[in-house]
A protein has these predicted regions:
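Catalytic active-site module of serine/aspartate enzymes centered on a nucleophile-bearing elbow/loop
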Residues: 281, 287-329
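Accessory cap/linker subdomain of secreted extracellular hydrolases
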Residues: 157-227, 231-234
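N-terminal cap/lid segment of alpha/beta-hydrolase-fold proteins
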Residues: 18-41
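Primarily recognizes the serine-hydrolase "nucleophile elbow" in alpha/beta-hydrolase
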Residues: 120-177
Length: 329
């Protein structure tokens, strides 16, 4: 019994030693994250950027998204000799002190945060460069980060990342997911009016809009949406020559293979991996909506086959990991 207890304590101490809370400077206070996996300059390091809204470092978002996609990625990569940093976005969760208003943000501001993390991670680990993995909207942050200052970045992993301007994607999502009802066409008409205003860089009037749309496009987030709408992911990926892995599931209800193919067309040398039967959370799921969304709430459902293999293969095989040895910025 004592031997088992000693082994348990040792295992716990080793686990604790492999994960550490870390900080990077934010605009008003610290950005916070968790560095996990093997230590030392020989281990590649992946910075994970979560998706839209209030997504946390694990990739979860209250109330319905508990798939823990980023945590599962970190654990799987650690088992393959790859370290990772999972971070909370400015103003949210453990990074709540970084800014007073998390909705007052731009892609460029998120890119500034990513650069701050890259500097911290290179100094702490001794790694010559850091990979950036962006999930969903986080992939746009990864592209913005690479386009503003590529130094110190090994390459990009774009996981379920939009490949078309956000306006086109939102229109497609609403058309695909709104059920047939008397409210369907009025909602689509209202969406078109809102997006047309925001795409023109102007605030949208929500006075006669249904509560669902009014919540999504509330005045406090409209400046950020205007900023997002002005970016074309295909042009962004074409502007960088860093190694890129594009990961896309075929049963993703939010981002589709058309997005992945648009990114790949803009960068023909990028590595595109199609994951059959895999949804937006990188879990195996059917295309049927109800069953697909059930995987969003299940942290015990493992990542789909091929996800970790694709990422680890890119990170461990690509020469960018060892060749991009520019000085820390």
């Amino acid at each position: 019994m004592r031997l088992l207890l000693t082994a348990a304590v040792l295992a716990a101490s080793l686990a604790a030693a492999s994960a550490a809370e870390i900080e990077a400077p934010g605009p008003q206070g610290p950005l916070r994250g968790l560095l996990a996996g093997p230590a030392g300059a020989d281990a590649p390091v992946v910075l994970m950027i979560p998706g839209s809204g209030t997504s946390d470092r694990d990739g979860n978002q209250f109330p319905g998204i508990r798939a823990a996609t980023l945590r599962l990625l970190a654990e799987g990569l650690a088992a393959r000799g790859i370290a990772s940093a999972r971070v909370d976005k400015r103003g949210l969760n453990h990074s709540s002190e970084a800014v007073s208003d998390p909705e007052d943000v731009t892609l460029a501001a998120y890119a500034d945060d990513a650069h701050a993390w890259i500097k911290v991670l290179r100094e702490r680990t001794g790694a010559p460069c850091v990979w950036i993995l962006g999930h969903s909207e986080g992939g746009l942050v990864a592209l913005k980060t690479a386009s503003t200052r590529p130094e110190g970045i090994c390459g990009l992993v774009l996981a379920a990342t939009p490949g078309r301007p956000l306006g086109a994607l939102l229109r497609e999502q609403f058309r695909a997911n709104l059920p047939e009802s008397p409210l369907r066409q009025p909602t689509l008409d209202a969406l078109e009016a809102i997006l047309s205003k925001l795409e023109a860089g102007q605030p949208a009037d929500l006075s006669n809009v249904n509560p669902q749309l009014a919540g999504i496009f509330r005045p406090s987030v409209q400046p950020y949406v205007i900023d997002l709408l002005a970016h074309d992911p295909a042009k962004m990926i074409a502007a960088t020559d860093l190694p890129v892995l594009i990961l896309q599931g075929t049963t993703d209800l939010q981002v589709t293979m058309a997005d992945a193919e648009a990114l790949a067309a803009a960068r023909p040398d990028a590595r595109l991996v199609r994951l059959d039967g895999v949804n937006h959370m990188f879990k195996s799921a059917p295309a049927e909506r109800t069953a697909n969304l059930e995987a969003y709430a299940n942290p015990d459902l493992p990542l789909a086959d091929g996800v970790l293999e694709a990422i680890a293969g890119m990170v461990l095989d690509d020469p960018g990991t060892t060749s991009r040895r520019s000085p820390a910025q």
